[in-house]
Amino acid sequence: MRCGRQVSPLRDHFQKSSPSLNGRGNGRILKLPDLTKRFTAGLRNSGSPGVRRRLRPDPFRISHLMACLMTTSLITGGSGFIGSHLAEHLLRRGDDVIVVDDLSTGCQNNLSGIMEHPRLDFIEGSIDDVALVAELLGRSDRVFHLAAAVGVALIAKEPIQTIERNVYPTQLILDRLGSMAQRGRQVPCFIASTSEVYGKNPKDTWSEEDDLVFGATTRPRWSYGVSKAIDEFLALAYVKQQGLPIVVGRFFNVVGPRQTGAYGMVLPRFVEAALAGRPLVVHDDGHQVRCFAHVDDIIQAVVKLIETPAASGRVYNIGSDQPVSILDLAKRVIERTNSSSEIQFQSYSDAYDQSFEDIRRRVPDLQRIHDAIGFRPTMNLNDIIDSVANQYASETP
Ligand SMILES: NC(=O)c1ccc[n+]([C@@H]2O[C@H](COP(=O)([O-])OP(=O)(O)OC[C@H]3O[C@@H](n4cnc5c(N)ncnc54)[C@H](O)[C@@H]3O)[C@@H](O)[C@H]2O)c1
């Protein structure tokens, strides 16, 4: 079963009065023999190429290195689309993982493959809860802050929630990280931002030092980009004033299995419609341009950024730089899924409301992230569509 409801019932979730702290997972069981094996395997592979050395394990060194390997990663919004993939990836690597999520747009089912994992703690709660944030940061060696109000349809409908959800919890987390740093404990943090911060900048390709060009405040869709820009300003201010190790990533259309189309995401909407033989609804004339990157590529970049000290204190575009128009995307989805669906066009005012303004072209310059961590996306559009279609097909009875 996939996550995602229609936009209107979200209000119920947003208005939950007091968030519950509901921890699941067995949490603290460490698999020491696994770690020892991993460490000694690492030793065997080290040294000059082709030279195999027999090493006598040094118990002190092993326990020290095992302590280094036992990282506890906190993922806010870890039951969401990107967060759940990140949680799986970190568990596979041997991290302890704490997921905190209020299940507003994410859902527990996204974690079904790892819910019983002994190194996962799942906490149902909101990161606007001061005590909860303090407790979770106190247990973490690094933080991936992904929780936010996400999705064009949701943002157009719920602008108050967008602004509150995206600004206040980020400030709370940064403030707490600042206090911890003052007491001598620096915890690296990745902050998820978005290509929406560029607004409607008319450049063909956007690079990190470009201007942010937003529309009028009477148009609620800009509240998402502006709220994320405030997060970036805050993060960079904490870097400057308090020396916190924070890195900001601006995601450009991340897609893959488990993404829900319920909040306006285009690829899951198209794939679902194509597989069901329904029309694919393209907004406006379909000539607006986007770049789609697979979540597996994005996760690699996020982890590498937080683990690269030289990347700290900077903002990075993260995504694919291969442009495709939404109309061509719809055609490609129909072709890859062998669908007989038709394409229908819908105006923005019918899809959202009269005030809606879109961005015609959104293509990142990836030079900075390539220079910092050697990042290049590995999956092309066909691979990506197939991966999403396979997920839907496998869920159809
Ligand atoms: N998917 C994309 O293409 C994309 C593009 C740009 C930016 N981003 C950013 O990446 C991050 C993850 O996005 P996603 O696509 O996985 O969306 P998502 O909606 O699947 O994930 C967000 C998660 O945050 C949770 N959440 C929201 N408010 C919370 C709160 N106060 N406390 C606890 N949990 C809360 C939601 O329940 C959800 O599980 C977001 O910050 C988003 O702005 C995503």
Q: What kind of feature is each model-predicted range?
A:
Residues 13-16, 27, 37-38:
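Alpha-helix boundary/capping motif
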Residues 20, 31-32, 48-51, 56:
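N-terminal amphipathic/hydrophobic targeting modules at extreme N-termini
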Residues 4-6, 20, 40-41, 54:
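Short Gly/Ser/Thr- and charged-rich N-terminal loops/segments
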